[in-house]
Amino acid sequence: GQRQMCIRDRDGRLGHGDYEDRDEPERLVFFDERKLAPRIIAAGDAHSLVVVDAAVGATAPEGVYAWGRGAHGRLGLGRTLNKKTPQHVETWPSCYKGMHVIGAALGGAHSLVLAEKAIPASGANPWGRQRHLYAWAYGGNGQIGDECMTDRARPTRVKLPRQEVVQQVACGKAHSLAVTAHGDLYAWGKGWRGELGLGDDRNRCGPEKVDGKHQFLKVAAGDRHTLAIALKHK
């Protein structure tokens, strides 16, 4: 299928190779020209991310591509420059080796990627999958989740309890969320308006479990609020 990009472009976020606005959809040819097939897309306030597979005859590697505003390291390239065309993210930590990206979400100025690889099933992990969550860019409110409140220009692993297998992720403007296979919801980042659901208005710099009375199925986030689908009792 064809990728369409439109609306505002002040820092290359549309990926067309210029800084011109578009007032109607325009095909983004970068991936077609390289025989790459997008399968996951995400958009932040001023940056864009696509996960692609390589088709037969591909002339560029598969994986994660990002472009747009680079301030705070939004693009995960190890630098803070804007990019007006898609850039392959190659700055992963060693634990990413063998991983396959299955999900992504972008916040106002930060990025989350969920990746997995197959492992032998066990009592603690009957799903037979190991999943890692990676985050990068602006961390001033703790939204990266690595127990610090500093920016990260490269993907950094976010650690949840070992028994948890993340199923879905979401980003608000400055907070992050993850739903696990056990039905647990974890939240971190900016909490000034109660968007973390933790009963107060404090920021969190690492994942913290929300209300254990519900089995969460899906989560979504707005600028300063959170929406979830849940069963009443586990």
Please give the residue ranges for each predicted region:
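Eukaryote-biased RCC1-like beta-propeller repeat architecture
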Residues: 1-4, 8-234
